[in-house]
Amino acid sequence: MKISEVKELLLGNPSSEQLKMLQADERSGVQKLLTAYYKRLEKEAQEKERFTKMLAYEREYYAHGVQYVAGVDEAGRGPLAGPLVIAAVILPRNAFIAGLNDSKQLSAAKRDKLYDEIIAKAVAIEVNIVSVSNIDKYNIYAATQRGMAQVLEHLPVQPQVALIDAMPVTAKNMECVPIVHGDALSASIAAASIIAKVTRDRIMERLDTLFPDYGFAHNKGYGSGAHMQAIAEFGATKWHRRSYEPVKSMQLEPVAAADNELYSPQLDCHYVFSIDA
């Protein structure tokens, strides 16, 4: 068997007989490929073990007769500009999504890849875009609680249990369980964190094309030095949170709205599955 054929074989699922044959092959190229193959298997086994641990909360509820468990997380509580995005995700009981983790621990490219896989595999997904107006009206904590309750009530498949990243929430006809660092401990919450983060990043990238002076594509609405300088020079857009300092103290008139805005800073929006800027 040629080395190229061995490589192709080991990319698949070789039989035990084929592996024995390759182990007896003294060619260094074959042995290197075998070593790489076993390392890959070990890495895959470790990832499956890690993912299984991330399903511990969900499996405990399923073992007690619960039919559906949702995970809930948000993106955008801290920025000076842009909406708050909240996502709820129900994963299949037998789900396996390699690399799933807290969105903050992942690169943008990895989040985008996982976003697509979550969309493809999830039982149900709901996204709630909480408006800047409601953030300013209710304060960010209350707006988050309110938005999380709403995203659960709008889920097309209703869960009996909702696992929520650190936030105490009350929603109709379900048990809501806050979990500190839940996005690193629960697969469902981690999936929700990725959906929320990718969705919000795409919104901010869209807003960057409409308000290019503020660097939204890069700062995602956080108060970087360049962002603060732009506010001082050009004023605050209607996407800036007037209840957040230092914008609150600046008392600036809003920049004129763009004619082709895709989202509203005054109205909450609900989306099932995905939002593409």
Feature roles, as predicted:
Residues 1-70, 77-277:
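RNase H-like, Mg2+-dependent phosphodiesterase core
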